[in-house]
A protein has these predicted regions:
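Patatin-like phospholipase
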Residues: 1-174
Length: 174
């Protein structure tokens, strides 16, 4: 909550089987915990909690954004899907199905826009070498939708006013 643009980050407490929503604390730890996939990366210890990837319990936290910020409009991006039935010899997929809860990837048209990317079989969890491809795909998709987004999200704060607020924020930093 102390950032210029308030931020939320979702991780998972697998011991207590619940999501954790970070609104304060160490930003680096929160972001790192939110993408710590079990069996691939070690958990991040935050307080007494071993935190893992937030996608285990909430892979599309639009509900968190609605609850904490009551936004007029949400721009969502779906890059994964709920698990398919795993094959008998795919132990990792079986464990993933055991621990991951299904996510609701829906936004009402009046409250937002959802960008869907069907990447099944094309990009895997550890395909870090495809980051530029994914960035370019997301950028191109956003450009295709930008006119419809601008129609629904007019600028509500004049740019000069926003810049003054940014400068005041920067001056308040230690």
């Amino acid at each position: 909550d102390s950032l210029f643009v308030p931020f939320r980050c979702v991780a998972s407490d697998v011991y207590n089987k619940r999501e954790i929503v970070f609104s304060q604390g160490d930003l680096g730890d929160a972001v790192r915990a939110s993408m710590t996939f079990p069996l691939v990366f070690r958990p991040i210890k935050i307080g007494e909690v071993l935190a893992y990837d937030g996608g285990i319990y909430n892979n599309f936290p639009a509900d968190v954004m609605k609850r904490d910020f009551a936004p007029d409009y949400i721009i969502g991006s779906v890059v994964s899907s709920n698990n398919e039935q795993p094959e008998a010899d795919d132990i990792v997929a079986q464990i993933e199905s055991l621990i991951m809860q299904a996510s609701n990837y829906e936004l009402p048209d009046t409250n937002g826009i959802l960008m869907n990317f069907d990447l099944q079989g094309e990009v895997g969890l550890l395909d870090f070498d495809k980051a530029q491809y994914l960035f370019d795909l997301g950028y191109a998709t956003t450009l295709e939708l930008i006119d419809s987004i601008k129609k629904k999200v007019p600028r509500s704060v004049p740019l000069d006013s926003l810049n003054k607020r940014r400068e005041a924020y920067k001056e308040s930093l230690p």
